[in-house]
Design a protein with these regions (language model features):
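Generic protein-terminus/edge-of-domain signal
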Residues: 1-66, 70-72
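Residue-level detector of short, conserved catalytic/binding motifs and their immediate flanks
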Residues: 53, 78, 99
Length: 136
């Protein structure tokens, strides 16, 4: 059986809403989470951002995903990609299981490689709302 929420139930951020937990290490820049949004404080993964990219799958349930100023409702079997440094929040009114991967884009290709310059960097430079665009 998979462990839900890996021992924590609240996102901790600094004054800019940057998440303070490390997602992997410099040597291994990848972290897999298996979480139930319902088990988090106030049944949400509150506003935060990080320099890593994130893939989130809704394995079971329904959740509202707020990414920048946009809202997406995802159901079982649907997924979302969250770009680097983009403010986001997840909430649910029921138990909703979300396996997710948070990792450095450099895991895909080295910064000085053709793959990075041609395919990865343009995705990372896509203009999305920044953490500063969200008001309390």
């Amino acid at each position: 059986m998979k462990n839900l929420n890996d021992g924590y139930a609240k996102i901790i951020t600094d004054e800019t809403l940057r998440e303070t937990i490390s997602h992997g290490s410099e040597e291994y820049p990848f972290r897999y989470y298996y979480e139930d949004i319902w088990l988090f404080d106030l049944h949400c993964i509150d506003w935060h951002w990080h320099p890593e990219v994130e893939f989130v799958l809704v394995e079971n349930g329904t959740a509202d995903f707020f990414v920048g100023s946009s809202r997406y409702v995802l159901n079982t079997g649907e997924a979302i990609f969250i770009n680097t440094q983009v403010i986001h929040r997840f909430e649910s009114s029921e138990s909703t299981i979300i396996p997710n991967m948070v990792f450095s884009p450099l895991l895909i290709a080295a910064e000085n490689s053709l793959i990075y310059r041609k395919y990865i960097k343009p995705c990372l430079l896509y203009t999305s709302p920044s953490p500063r665009d969200v008001e309390e």
